[in-house]
Amino acid sequence: MQNGGGDGNEAGRGTAVITRTKTKTKKPSLYRVLILNDDYTPMEFVVHVLERFFQKDREAATRIMLHVHNHGVGECGVYTFEVAETKVSQVMDFARQNQHPLQCVMEKK
């Protein structure tokens, strides 16, 4: 029976060096979700989309809708790729279901 000491074999004893590598976590790329102006989608529908899918209050949604109307494009929000992709898909599906040609796109920030 052995006690907690060694087994008499001194091989393998020595100084070990443990190195720690710092991994830099890269922040995910961000994407802007944009709504594009068209001549057919009602302004109220755009406001509804902004409230429903981007959690904008009525005032912010109206401000963005007017920016889209006057400048041709407006930013709905900035998200990671997966979230932005989902938002674009949800908006496009909702617009099609309601027979509106509204376009929603994403671009890398």
UniProtKB/Swiss-Prot annotation:
What gene is it encoded by? Answer: clpS1
Please give the Gene3D superfamilies that the UniProt record associates with this protein: 3.30.1390.10
One GO term (biological process): proteolysis
Quaternary structure and interacting proteins, as annotated:
Binds to the N-terminal domain of the chaperone ClpA.
What name is this protein filed under?
Answer: ATP-dependent Clp protease adapter protein ClpS 1
In this chain, the stretch annotated as Disordered covers: 1-24
What job does the chain carry out? Answer: Involved in the modulation of the specificity of the ClpAP-mediated ATP-dependent protein degradation.
Highest taxon of source: Bacteria
Read off the Pfam families from this record: ClpS
**HAMAP family in UniProt:** ClpS (MF_00302)
What family is this protein classified in? Belongs to the ClpS family.
Q: NCBIfam families from the entry?
A: PRK00033.1-2 (NF000669), PRK00033.1-5 (NF000672)
Check the record and name the SUPFAM superfamilies matching this protein: ClpS-like (SSF54736)
The UniProt regions of compositional bias labelled Gly residues, in chain numbering, are 1-11
